[in-house]
Structures are given as structure tokens and as C-alpha cells.
Amino acid sequence: EIRLSLVGSEMCIRDSNMTMTIMSAAREVSALGDDTDMAALCKAISSGSLRGARGNSGVILSQLFRGFTKSIKEEQVLDIPVLTRAFEKAVETAYKAVMKPKEGTILTVAKGMSDRALELCDDTEDLVYFCEEVIKEGDRVLDLTPEMLPVLKQAGVVDSGGQGLMQVLKGAYEAFLGKEIDWTVTETAAPAGAPFAGSQETVLEESDIKFGYCTE
């Protein structure tokens, strides 16, 4: 499911920096043979996303992947407690990668989902319900980003980094459900003056990112 979600997600993310990050991870995952294990898969996702990371949104996404995969690399089954810990580790890693975290960005959306996962962890054993509720919370927080960042409210858009993250999570969930993925890649130019989702690129300076390479 992880393998499919990476390839599927790259098809629908409009943020080019995040797309390049996802594509880099997907290429490394695709290069793995069929007879691979969780540790190798996690290493490919982490290193591939980090190598392909572009811009703040891409770097932060790679750090979310890094924390998430580091948490699950020794696991054989991804159940609710494992996923909850992975969400927490992903958010912790991403926040540590930014010197001056700003709310209303991809970081806020990720933290909202992590917090919701923690709330649900002891209340349900239904993985489908768990995933749906976590994604629902991510969408809710994403819709609030214009209220957190004046630049987004002025433009009348949500944060594009957070929006891209939601596409990644939804792609992973659809792969988990066994839904067919549309492999068609289309590139369309937005009409002049059409509103794009804002990005944390406008509110997080490049100098805010502590590192763009693996420190391990």
C-alpha cells in the first residue's frame, strides 16, 4: 500500500516542489525488487524524498516521511498504535527541521492529524474509521489555515503545502482500500488570474529550514 500510494499521490499534487519530492521517493521505491522488507522500503522512501526535496514544502514533506518511516521501519504490521506513534514522530521530526515554525502551514495540518490520531488510539480498533477520522481532521485544519495566516486569507486560499500533504494521505488511504489508481498524468496550465492555493513558501524563509540533508 505504501508503494502504491507514493506513485499515486504524485499524479494529483499541484505544488511542483512537493511533486518532485514524491516522484523522487517513488522512483527509489520502484527500484526495489518485489522481495523487499519494511526496513528497505522505509529507507527508500526517506532517502528518495530527501534527495528530491525542493523548496520548503518539499523539505518539510521529506522530514515528515523521515520521521514516519523511522518509526515504522522495524514493524511488520501497521496497526492503529503503530500509525499513531508514526504520526507523532513525523510531526516531531518536521517541527525540529524548522527553526521558526509558523502555524497555518503544512506543519499545522500534520500536527492536527497527529493529535486526532492520539485521541482515537485508545478508543477504536477500526483501522478504516481511524484513517477516515484522521484525514477528516486534516481537511478541517487545512480549511482553517487562512484564519492563521493573513497572506492566505487575503488571497482567499488555503495553504498549498497542507493541501499537498492531504493528497498524499488520501492517496495512501485509497491504496489501503485497494482502489484503482488513475495512472494518467496530465499537465494543465491555470487560466490567467486563477487563484492557486497559497504556500508556506511565502511565510517560511529558506533560512528557517535547519537542514536539507540527512544528519544521521
Placement of each model-derived feature along the sequence:
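Transmembrane helical cores of multi-pass ion-transport proteins
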Residues: 27-48, 64, 71-91
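Conserved phosphate/anionic-ligand binding catalytic regions in large, soluble enzymes, centered on
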Residues: 9-10, 14-20, 48-66, 148-174
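Accessory interaction regions appended to the cores of large information-processing enzymes
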Residues: 195-200
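Regular secondary-structure segments
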Residues: 19-33, 62-69, 73, 95, ...
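Short glycine-/aliphatic-rich beta-strand segments at the starts of folded cytosolic domains
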Residues: 207-216
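Single conserved hydrophobic/aromatic residue that forms the stacking wall/gate
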Residues: 1-8
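Non-catalytic interaction/clamp surfaces of large macromolecular machines
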Residues: 77-192
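Short, hydrophobic/aliphatic alpha-helical segments
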Residues: 3, 33-50, 136-157
